[in-house]
Structure formats: C-alpha cells, structure tokens
C-alpha cells in the first residue's frame, strides 16, 4: 500500500478523506506543528476509526531530515494569510493585518521544500492554500521548482469554474496550477498545485506481498526511524 503524509493536517478533515481513499491499506502519517491543533487532529481521526494511522506533532523540516524520500504522496495544505476566507470569517481580516502574506511566505517556502525532500521518486505532492496572494501561491511554486529541479508541475483534472494559475512566461508552466475564485464557482478562494518528482514510478517499486506475521515494510521503516518504543502486541496486521 501507499505511504501518504498529510503535513499540515489539523483539524483532520483532509486526513479522514485520505484514510477513506487508502481503505485500510498502506500507512497514513498526519502531522500538525501546533500542539493544541495536533490534539484536535488526534481526536478527530480516532473518532473516524482509522487503523493505519500515525499522528505527529513536529516541525515538518525536522521530519524531512529523518524521512528523506520516504512517502509516495505528500499533501501540504499550507498555513496562509487566509485571504480567500475573508467573506466567510471576518476575524481573518484582523489576523491578516497582524500577519500578512510576507509572514507566511517564508513558512510556506520552507515546508514545500521539506515536502519535496520527503517524496519518493515518481511520487506526487499537492500544495494548496486558501489565499489569493501570488506571494504565497505562484511564488511558492517557483521557489520549489527553482530549488528542486527534480520536481515538475503536472496537470490537474479541470472542472467548470477552475482558473489557471498566474503564469510568468518564464518556463515554469504555472498555468497548470489552479485558482478558485468565489465569483467563478461555489465556495471560497483557493490555490492548488500538483507536482511529480522525477524518477522511477513509485507504483513499480517493490512492495511487501505476503507474510501476515511480519510488519509491512513501510510501517517497519517508519517505526525504525522514530525514537518511540512500540508494543508490537497491540499492532494487528
């Protein structure tokens, strides 16, 4: 099964959707750097009853230093200035005045590079925000493509109301990214970009095919790279 990482997962809606897609196969690792939000994340995924799950409360950059090239797929719903949500929540306007796009841009650039580093060759990374700011959207994409030349943008299945990313005519193919505007389709403002890492397709890599008495390779690799002690009697395969 696939090994999937939800980097900025709280409160857990995306993680439960990913868990449903995995359908009790592979491994889902979810993380949030905020202690309080990680607790909410843990509570929500426990209610959902996800059996193949590990919840972390760590800095993504630190995780990347231990799990380089580990995940088949990475989801980054990045912390952002929230411009796309102003219509829904007026409190976000006050938050934007305190910490605007410039504040979040550096955070996003760090975590998008960390996400790429944790991705296997042939794996896919989805980067999203709920802001209109080019600084947080297309500029984050350019930062990744410039610093990780083994990453490239791929097309996202079009839907009515989707708009292309703001292209710069500099060869980055930013038109493959998607912008969602509330006056174009139902919902709030969002930005989405899908990347693929160069190299052998991860689906062709060797996977464990048998041995019910043994831990799946992807789970054992993860446990071997953590500092926690696990009670194997509580792990049911």
Label each residue range with its predicted role:
Residues 1-235:
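S-adenosylmethionine
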């Amino acid at each position: 099964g696939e090994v999937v990482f939800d980097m900025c997962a709280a409160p857990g809606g995306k993680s439960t959707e990913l868990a449903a897609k995995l359908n009790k196969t592979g491994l889902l690792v979810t993380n949030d750097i905020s202690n309080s939000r990680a607790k909410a994340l843990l509570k929500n995924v426990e209610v959902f009853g996800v059996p193949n799950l590990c919840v972390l409360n760590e800095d993504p950059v630190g995780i990347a230093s231990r799990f380089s090239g580990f995940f088949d797929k990475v989801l980054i719903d990045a912390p952002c200035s929230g411009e796309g949500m102003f219509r829904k929540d007026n409190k976000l306007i006050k938050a934007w005045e305190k910490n605007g796009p410039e504040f979040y841009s550096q955070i996003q650039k760090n975590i998008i590079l960390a996400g790429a580093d944790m991705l296997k060759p042939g794996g896919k990374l989805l980067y999203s925000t709920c802001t209109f700011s080019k600084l947080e959207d297309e500029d984050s994409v350019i930062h990744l493509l410039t610093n990780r030349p083994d990453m490239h943008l791929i097309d996202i299945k079009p839907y009515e109301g989707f708009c292309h990313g703001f292209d710069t005519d500099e060869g980055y193919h930013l038109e493959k990214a998607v912008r969602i505007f509330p006056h174009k389709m139902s919902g709030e403002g969002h930005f989405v970009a899908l990347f693929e890492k160069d190299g052998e397709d991860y689906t062709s890599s060797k996977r464990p095919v048998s041995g019910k008495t043994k831990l799946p390779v992807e789970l054992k690799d993860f446990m071997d790279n953590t500092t926690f002690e696990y009670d194997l009697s509580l792990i049911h395969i």
